[in-house]
């Protein structure tokens, strides 16, 4: 079993390393001391540089105090004052109906100033829209990497930086989640900005004045992928801060549980049922995000009801069929279920369920004789990816999946 755990750790390192090193940005000269240039393959430097992508894309009223770039400042501060009204042709306001606003005004606008605050978070890429699916994916993946390999961040002096980024992500997710007096989700803002408007004009975010409508999901139009992926990030955030800031960690976990409960108790629907995504980041499934969140919540709580939510939707065969990305979390799910299936927890305080595969076979009516191993599936997925089985490997080693955002898959 010890050897199996070591295999799992190596597979996690390979998967998360490929995801993290997607970005290449210019770095402030004064912040490069911990990343020496005198080695052929400087992974410490690659780790350091990759995090600065998020400084470049940070948004809101607290950019200046949290950012490591001198040329970045507060931007889209008016996201803190989105008029709490149905949007018109000018795209000012929200996608909420007037009746919904009237019913939940005290929750959406507790200070009664007529606005809803959805400031913070991160821009998507070169544009300035805050898209929920890639944002939640990035938040959970960065958090996962820090949780699994915290010592590496500390040894390279990147722990303070990544914690700043993780707090900024997850503070935004909590701000965008509106709870009633019972702690139940009333609404969740999954997007700020309109892709069509934003992509028609390119400028510095600090001087942007374009309309930035806020899009919410509610019980009347639930979107499982958004709330589940946000729940996963907040659950991981609990693990990352439970020993250093227990009150903040507990708050993150409360929000994670509330968001997952919303996903569980409402009709399962995709993000393309609403008016925000249009053709931008329309998810093709919700099951992967749902299982992703449930697996983390079981790992934290040991509550087997979360595993019961996984059994009907878990696709054991999916991981090698595509890459780990915002629209396909199955490789991540497989890794966490691999850890859950072990005899002993990977880290102190985690919960395991060694009989998971057998229980899944029973629930999914699989043959009891079929061999299933989560880590073997992950290994197959990495081999398939590295050999171009789900994309094209160029002569220089660049992995090309499709024309849109190809660098994200390298």
Regions found by a protein language model. Give the residues of each.
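Small side chains
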Residues: 14-17, 230
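Glycan-recognition and catalytic cores of secretory/periplasmic carbohydrate-active enzymes
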Residues: 35-136, 140-410
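Sec-dependent signal peptide cleavage junction
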Residues: 24-37
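Bacterial N-terminal signal peptides that target proteins for export
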Residues: 2-15
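Hydrophobic core
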Residues: 16-25
